[in-house]
Swiss-Prot record:
Catalytic activity: L-lysyl(9)-[histone H3] + S-adenosyl-L-methionine = N(6)-methyl-L-lysyl(9)-[histone H3] + S-adenosyl-L-homocysteine + H(+)
Knockout consequences: Mice die at birth but embryos display altered brown adipose tissue differentiation.
Domain called SET: residue spans: 82-211
Region span, Mediates interaction with SKI and regulation of TGF-beta signaling: 740-1275
Zinc finger (C2H2-type): 230-255, 282-304, 310-332, 338-361, 367-389, 395-417, 424-446, 951-973, 979-1002, 1008-1030
Gene Ontology terms: cellular component: cytoplasm; nucleoplasm; nucleus; transcription regulator complex; transcription repressor complex
Any GO BP: somatic stem cell population maintenance
Assembly information from the UniProt record: Interacts with CEBPA, CEBPB and CEBPD; the interaction is direct. Interacts with PPARG and PPARA; controls brown adipocytes. Interacts with CTBP1 and CTBP2; represses the expression of WAT-specific genes. Interacts with PPARGC1A and PPARGC1B; interaction with PPARGC1A or PPARGC1B activates the transcription of BAT-specific gene. Interacts with HDAC1, SKI and SMAD2; the interaction with SKI promotes the recruitment of SMAD3-HDAC1 complex on the promoter of TGF-beta target genes.
Name of protein: Histone-lysine N-methyltransferase PRDM16
SMART domains referenced in this protein's UniProt entry, alphabetically: SET, ZnF_C2H2
Length: 1275
């Protein structure tokens, strides 16, 4: 314990000491000094050198020469209790004193004593000096008094002479002798009081005496919680308890001791007391305390003779605490004392003083951030904070290479790796990792073998499992993830025994690889497993079902065939399919037998235990080296064009040599589309119309999205062997003619990426591809009998208008799905004109060349992209705005937890109609695939919630990475606002908001200045918003349609030139209707006869109960999105380019361009006249389509029915302008989607024979003869 300080009254002389205890007030205002605290009317004598070494004498400069010459008057500002009066004291030269007006009995207390801490005292009569025990000695003529320990570390004075303080106790004077004393000081509850120790008669002055020789420490109560004191009647000494008083009377009191022991026999006297024969007690020479015998005195002397470790080198004093020694040494050299100007603390080192000022006083947080204005007490804190603005993250995790701005965050992150009990081994370089995410990052830059060749990390690691999509009656022994109905949408595979989750139904482990466009590779590894085809019973999956059951009643087709280097390869493949299927069954049986022991070692992805791929409980990597060797062998075999033997890790894709011309390319489709099994239509006979349509879409996609989406790895090693779009082959209702999973050539060109050709050049490529036996140019009527069967239609349609995604994802989708079934090596989307016919009757998926797939940098799924923007225009839905911000395509699109999928639920539910139709051979799903809110009981909780439940909000279920985030989030539910402004009592839930409030509102700090008009702002965001206004005002009229305003009314800057607009258009790739215009312009119109041929099938689909949608039942958010896209197309067609400025309130053509992902677009201001004019003007240009072959069935994205206005009704309605504008906007977008969709419908595009507006209006409603789309029937 630290030595406790003592209080002493500064003495005027050796005999006259003042006893005036104090209670220091820590709230000393800055700038006050002792010189300011004198009282004009009360004059004190000049101190005659205080005994304390504290240099206060030089500060005592009395205003008058002598206290005897000073006039004595009674201050009016001091309230005196009615029991007392203030008049001249009986002590000579003391000035005023307190006199009693009534009788005061023993034990009464007066107080508390009001004092103020000071560095020095102006008048010694009205203050006390704080000293430590060791600084007080008997010759200093002061009493030792303990005070609060936290004040004992500093030496300072307290002043009771503050004007207006109301402390009348300061006028209690010091008695000349102890006989005149009638008061004693005591400390109760950290307050100083005077206590009556003698009866005081009326007219008697209150006096205190603290002569140390007369009264010891017991006179003053040392305890903060003082009990009633007891006074000795003989010597007037006070004691804290009655026992001490009795002991004192028996042994110590000189008057009572002799009488006590005279009556006691020798045998009754206390043993060892050693009372002298003369009956005299023993006195301590240091503290003058009396003891009854020598033994007690010796025990007491230990206190005085205790060895003290810290001794002063300038005087004999020693101290128990180093701090006391330092404080004492300051008295020897006052020049080295550094006093704080704001408080009474004194420091020996200037650095300590500076640290004290920064941390304790106003302006302490002197280090301000130049970017955001946040202040810090230390420069190191500011330096660490600046990392936030500079994007510098110096603290990097060595396991997963994630970086942080603060070391504490890195430590918190590392605790996540501690949960990983196993290591994941890179199959290329052998490096071990504790998380799949770190392994995934490593793979991007791994210097080992080629990752993207079919024999590398994307080698099939698991046998393919059959999907129950086509045949629900046959149980699948190897199916483990079908319980939720996810097997219909996501790849199913045997569940490795090493994975911790249940082997029964949970399909979520397969969910992540099933959504590569949703979950980027930064969160998940690129799994080497070969998923099955969910739509078809795969012969590779099940030995009992070696033949592919055709849902359309056609003969079973081989699932894998050879990719020939010549056009003869296709004929050989189709000619040997029966023979090949038989061999394939044997190959798969052998593969399953050999592969099963190595089930848990075949691929890195098998180590993933949750959807995050982070918490791993399995062992892995034991077979990695073997797999790598086998991969290398397989690569060699493929390069040489030799057959590859059936190997356990080959994934069941091995094929006998007799089935093809080049067996080396047999497993290409599966190994490279590790996520995507072949679509249904690819396994059937090819449709020339579908191929032509795909080429049309591919041309547009290549033109606008071409090589720009290829990542660095693709540029070095070729395109990724998987798609980064939504796997529509898992969706039974999706027309796979729109989403072909073509294969790439497996020769050397996998490693060489040729320069992409423009879509027009690609369309001009004449001859058939040597590696693409699939006829991309078969005319619709030629392929129709082989493609469709009357029993089961491929694409159910409900007559509603399902919008095609025209956003960045659509272009990405077009480049991948509709990218023409062309050889992958050229990275083009078509090499033949749509009209060229090559007439190959049948096709095998392995023969289908693969179109380029986008890298995960832009993972926009084909049908998910409208979902991303579905609430983009909902200004009134801030929650949706926040969701949209994080649902936009980006490299870090979703958090790996299942909560990310939970946030997608609302959007995905609007596409609920993608379930299998009850009227088709595909049975309806037992559980909605996207109903993540209420998963069936078969879904295990660990998979759903992961491991950080301790940071889960109990109100809304949100999961946070750290407790601080959860604490702050909970305040949104509880309404707690713990941070209160001291100026205006306004409360905040976040401390940074309070600091910003104080800076901007109360301190009027506006550090952000506009360089154009010198206007200042308190926040950077306000300045940015202001600068946007300058840009808008200074931009030409033609560019005023480029300013994008968000939901707060702020605007984002727009380019100042047309070239900049186009540059931003290419960067953001959000010019939807520019794509529509060019799409239609580059498409050719086809004959209308094929439309009526397929109407019976479409009518048959309309009768399906699960598909009750119509064009008027679109979700409002999707309609809004469609309206926005139409408006952009309107403005593009009128203004001639995509622009970024705010939509003007006038009907002047203006485009809405999304400058930033998280910004809200402005409210729509397009009038009906403007819409009609845009539609009519575009009728002759955009709608004058060239003959274009039809696609397969249109996309049937049925959604939950919501009310929507028909365009014709809106034209005649009397709704207010805002509703009219919004409705027109939605309907216009619907029409735009229908225009794209018309190219994929069986309905051909006719030459324009009606007015443009009528043609558009015909799109909205189902035709009278069927409920299918009737898009632009009469254009």
């Amino acid at each position: 314990m630290r030595s406790k300080a003592r209080a002493r009254k500064l003495a005027k002389s050796d005999g006259d000491v003042v006893n005036n205890m104090y209670e220091p007030d820590p709230d000393l205002l800055a700038g006050q000094s002792a010189e300011e605290e004198t009282e004009d009317g009360i004059l004190s004598p000049i101190p005659m050198g205080p005994p304390s070494p504290f240099p206060t004498s030089e500060d005592f400069t009395p205003k008058e020469g002598s206290p005897y010459e000073a006039p004595v008057y009674i201050p009016e500002d001091i309230p005196i209790p009615p029991d007392f009066e203030l008049r001249e004291s009986s002590i000579p030269g003391a000035g005023l004193g307190i006199w009693a007006k009534r009788k005061m009995e023993i034990g009464e207390r007066f107080g508390p004593y009001v004092v103020t801490p000071r560095a020095a005292l102006k008048e010694a009569d009205f203050g006390w000096e704080m000293l430590t025990d060791t600084e007080v000695s008997s010759q200093e003529s002061c009493i030792k008094k303990q005070i609060s320990e936290d004040l004992g570390s500093e030496k300072f004075c307290v002043d009771a002479n503050q004007a207006g303080s109301g402390s009348w106790l300061k006028y209690i004077r010091v008695a000349c002798s102890c006989d005149d004393q009638n008061l004693a000081m005591c400390q109760i509850n950290e307050q100083i009081y005077y206590k009556v120790i003698k009866d005081i008669e009326p007219g008697e002055e209150l006096l205190v005496h603290v002569k140390e020789g007369a009264y010891s420490l017991g006179v003053m109560a040392p305890s903060l919680d003082e009990d009633p004191t007891f006074r000795c009647d003989e010597c007037d000494e006070l004691f804290q308890c009655r026992l001490d008083l009795r002991r004192h009377k028996k042994y110590a009191c000189s008057s009572a001791g002799a009488q006590l022991y005279e009556g006691l026999g020798e045998e009754l006297k206390p043993e060892g007391l050693g009372v002298g024969s003369d009956g005299q007690a023993h006195e301590c020479k240091d503290c003058e305390r009396m003891f009854p015998n020598k033994y007690s005195l010796e025990q007491h002397m230990i206190v005085h003779t205790e060895e003290r470790e810290y001794k002063c080198d300038q005087c004999p004093k020693a101290f128990n605490w180093k701090s006391n020694l330092i404080r004492h040494q300051m008295s020897h050299d006052s020049g080295k004392r550094f006093e704080c100007e704001n408080c009474v603390k004194v420091f020996t080192d200037p650095s300590n003083l500076q640290r004290h000022i920064r941390s304790q006083h106003v302006g302490a947080r002197a280090h301000a951030c130049p970017d955001c204005g946040k202040t810090f007490a230390t420069s190191s804190g500011l330096k660490q904070h600046k990392h936030i603005h500079s994007t510098v993250k110096p603290f990097i995790c060595e396991v997963c290479h994630k970086s942080y701005t603060q070391f504490s965050n890195l430590c918190r992150h590392k605790r996540m790796h501690a949960d990983c009990r196993t290591q994941i081994k890179c199959k290329d370089c052998g490096q071990m990792f504790s998380t799949t995410s770190s392994l995934n990052k490593h793979r991007r830059f791994c210097e080992g073998k080629n990752h993207y060749t079919p024999g590398s990390i994307f080698t099939p690691g698991l046998p393919l499992t059959p999907s129950p999509m086509m045949d629900k009656t046959k149980p699948s022994p190897t199916l483990n993830h079908g319980g939720l109905g996810f097997s219909e949408y996501f790849p199913s595979r045997p569940h490795p025994g090493s994975l911790p989750f249940s082997a029964a139904p949970p399909a979520f482990p397969a969910l992540t690889p099933g959504f590569p466009g949703i979950f980027p590779p930064s969160l998940y590894p690129r799994p080497p497993l070969l998923p099955p085809t969910p739509l078809l019973k795969s012969p590779l999956n099940h030995a009992q079902d070696a033949k592919l059951p055709s849902p359309l009643g056609n003969p079973a087709l081989p699932l894998v065939s050879a990719v020939s280097n010549s056009s003869q390869g296709a004929t050989a493949a189709t000619g040997s399919e029966e023979k090949f299927d038989g061999r394939l069954e044997d190959a798969y049986a052998e593969k399953v037998k050999n592969r099963s022991p190595d089930m848990s070692d075949g691929s890195d992805f098998e180590d993933i235990n949750t959807t995050t791929g982070t918490d791993l409980d399995t062992t892995t990597g034991t077979g990695s080296d073997l797999d790598s060797d086998l991969d290398s062998d397989r690569d060699k075999g493929k390069d040489k064009g030799k057959p590859v033997e059936s190997k356990p890790e080959f994934g069941g894709a091995s094929v006998p040599p007799g089935a093809m011309n080049s067996v080396a390319e047999v497993p290409a489709f599966y190994s490279q589309h590790s996520f995507f099994p072949p679509p249904e239509e690819q396994l059937l006979t090819a449709s020339g119309a579908a191929g032509d349509s795909i080429k049309a879409i591919a041309s547009i996609a290549e033109k606008y999205f071409g090589p720009g989406f290829m990542s660095m790895q693709e540029k070095k090693l070729g395109s990724l062997p998987y798609h980064s779009v939504f796997p529509f082959q898992f969706l039974p209702n999706f027309p796979h003619s729109l989403y072909p999973f073509t294969d790439r050539a497996l020769a050397h060109n996998l490693l060489v990426k040729a320069e992409p050709k423009s879509p027009r050049d690609a369309l001009k490529v004449g001859g058939p591809s040597a590696e693409c036996p699939f006829d991309l140019t078969t005319k619709p009527k030629e392929a129709k009998p082989a493609l469709l069967a009357p029993k089961v239609p491929l694409i159910p349609s409900s007559g509603e208008e399902q919008p095609l995604d025209l956003s960045i994802g659509s272009r990405a989708r077009a480049s991948q799905n509709g990218g023409g079934r062309e050889p992958r090596k050229n990275h083009v989307y078509g090499e033949r004109k749509p009209g060229v016919s090559e007439g190959l009757p049948k096709v095998c998926p392995a023969q289908l060349p693969q179109q380029p797939s986008l890298h995960y940098a832009k993972p926009s799924p084909f049908f998910m992209d409208p979902i991303y923007r579905v609430e983009k225009r909902k200004v009134a839905d801030p929650v949706g705005v926040l969701k949209e911000k994080y649902l936009r395509p980006s490299p870090l699109l979703f958090h790996p937890q299942m909560s990310a999928i939970e946030t997608m639920t609302e959007k995905l539910e609007s596409f609920a109609a993608m379930k299998a139709d009850s009227g088709s051979s595909l049975q309806p799903l037992p559980h909605h695939p996207f109903n993540f809110r209420s998963p069936p009981p078969t879904l295990s909780d660990p998979i759903l919630r992961k491991g950080k439940e301790r940071y889960t909000c109990r109100y809304c279920g949100k999961i946070f990475p750290r407790s601080a985030n959860l604490t702050r989030h909970l305040r949104t539910h509880t309404g707690e606002q713990p941070y209160r402004c001291k100026y205006c009592d306004r409360s905040f839930s976040i401390s940074s908001n309070l600091q910003r409030h104080v800076r901007n509102i109360h301190n009027k700090e506006k550090p952000f200045k506009c360089h154009l008009c010198n206007r200042c702002f308190g926040q950077q965001t306000n300045l940015d918003r202001h600068l946007k206004k300058h840009e808008h005002e200074g931009a030409p009229v033609s560019q005023h349609s480029g300013v994008l305003t968000n939901h707060l009314g702020t605007s984002a800057s727009s380019p100042t030139s047309e070239s900049d607009n186009h540059a931003l258009l290419d960067e953001k790739e959000d010019s939807y209707f520019s794509e529509i215009r060019n799409f239609i312009a580059n498409s050719e119109m086809n004959q209308a006869s094929t439309r009526m041929d397929k109407r019976p099938e479409i009518q048959d689909l309309d009768s399906n109960p699960p598909c009750p949608g119509s064009a008027s039942a679109k979700p409002e958010d999707v309609e809004e999105e469609e309206e926005e896209e139409l408006e952009e197309e309107d403005d593009d067609s009128l203004a001639g380019k995509s622009q970024e400025d705010t939509v003007s309130p006038t009907p002047e053509p203006q485009g809405v361009y999304e400058d930033e992902e998280d910004e809200e677009p402005p409210s729509l201001t397009m009038g009906f006249d403007h819409t009609r004019r845009c539609v009519e003007e575009r009728g002759g240009g955009l709608l004058a389509l060239e003959p274009t072959p039809t696609f397969g069935k249109g996309l049937d994205l049925r959604r939950a029915a919501e009310e929507a206005f028909e365009v014709k009704d809106v034209l005649n309605s009397t709704l207010d302008s805002e509703v009219l504008k919004q409705t027109l906007y939605r309907q216009a977008k619907n029409q735009a989607y229908a225009m794209m969709l018309s190219l994929s419908e069986d309905t051909p595009l006719h030459a324009p024979s009606q007015s443009s507006l009528d043609a558009w209006l015909n799109i909205t409603g189902p035709s009278s003869e069927s409920g299918a789309f009737n898009p632009i029937n009469h254009l």
